[in-house]
Design a protein with these regions (language model features):
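Nucleic acid-binding interface residues in structured DNA/RNA-binding domains
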Residues: 1-109
Length: 109
């Protein structure tokens, strides 16, 4: 596991139950504003999805991941529903359920 992947996983652990964040928000939090795709790639290597809740990460429009690594979009939706996050046609309302690392210090290597 790379240092970057470890940092992504630690960031994802910060997302509270009942909230989601975006790949881009994680990348910005880690100091890589153009690193959304790298965040997604790291999440595909999540060794412990129960501990590292990657189902709480959606795209910038609130859309679920069609290639959600732990069973596809339907599984991600069921995990989000279990967290109390409604999903409408594969989209989470980011205005209501978005969480963006406000008031947290950026992590460093």
């Amino acid at each position: 596991m790379t240092n970057f992947e470890k940092r992504v996983f630690e960031a994802v652990k910060l997302i509270p139950k009942g909230k989601v964040t975006t790949y881009g928000a994680i990348a910005c939090f880690l100091g890589l504003p153009k690193g959304a795709r790298a965040v997604g790639n790291a999440l595909h290597k999540n060794p412990t999805p129960i501990i590292i809740p990657c189902h709480r990460v959606v795209n910038a429009k609130g859309m679920l991941a069609k290639a959600f690594v732990f069973g596809g979009e339907g599984v991600q939706e069921s995990f989000l529903l279990a967290d109390g996050i409604p999903v409408n046609n594969g989209i989470v309302n980011l205005t209501e359920h978005g969480w963006y690392f406000e008031n947290l210090k950026q992590t460093k290597d």
